[in-house]
């Protein structure tokens, strides 16, 4: 199994645990459940309908999975570029990053369902757009623009993941 396949399966397993915790069981949403020393409380956005919650949780599964793989491959590309300082000597790391950013953006875009609230959809579109812009900068070998564009991408990704956290279980001790 290649490195991307392993990472995807690991991310899917982690997201499945989160999804099961968020959607599973017949307990009330606000009821903390104790497993060993960990208490998990589901925190849901105020005023969201059940259909919106389910749609956003499903969307967030894809966001978490895609973002994890995207970050990993982008960071691998940047480490290699910083080491060799030349696109010609980078090997295939730039192509991996481009492919992962574009594929991740497309998978997230396709995961938006009609019940996803418009404010969440707007955040998704910003994340998808900044992912595609970052891929374009890498493909165009525009090193000077990478820092600015990657900061935008990071901000958009963090904003979307923070929104996802409003719909997913929150854990603590």
Language-model regions, residue ranges each:
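Bacterial N-terminal signal peptides that target proteins for export
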Residues: 1-12
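C-terminal motif of bacterial Sec signal peptides marking the signal peptidase cleavage site
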Residues: 19-22
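Bacterial signal peptide processing site
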Residues: 24-27
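Extracellular mucin-like PTS domains
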Residues: 32-46
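Alpha-helical segments in soluble extracytoplasmic regions
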Residues: 58-114, 149-165, 169
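Long, amphipathic, charge-rich alpha-helical segments that form helical bundles/coiled-coils
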Residues: 96-145
């Amino acid at each position: 199994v290649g490195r991307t396949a392993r990472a995807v399966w690991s991310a899917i397993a982690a997201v499945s645990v989160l999804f099961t915790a968020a959607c599973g069981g017949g307990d009330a949403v606000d009821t903390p459940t104790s497993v060993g020393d960990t208490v998990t409380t589901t925190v849901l956005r105020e005023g969201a309908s059940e259909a919106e919650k389910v749609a956003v949780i499903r969307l967030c599964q894809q966001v978490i999975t895609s973002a994890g793989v995207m970050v990993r491959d982008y960071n691998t590309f940047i480490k290699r570029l910083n080491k060799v300082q030349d696109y010609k000597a980078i090997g295939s790391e730039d192509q991996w990053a481009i492919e992962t950013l574009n594929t991740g953006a497309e998978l997230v875009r396709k995961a938006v369902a009609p019940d996803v609230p418009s404010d969440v959809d707007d955040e998704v579109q910003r994340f998808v757009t900044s992912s595609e812009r970052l891929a374009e900068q890498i493909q165009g070998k525009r090193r000077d623009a990478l820092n600015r564009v990657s900061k935008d991408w990071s901000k958009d990704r963090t904003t979307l993941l923070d929104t996802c956290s409003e719909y997913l279980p929150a854990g603590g001790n």
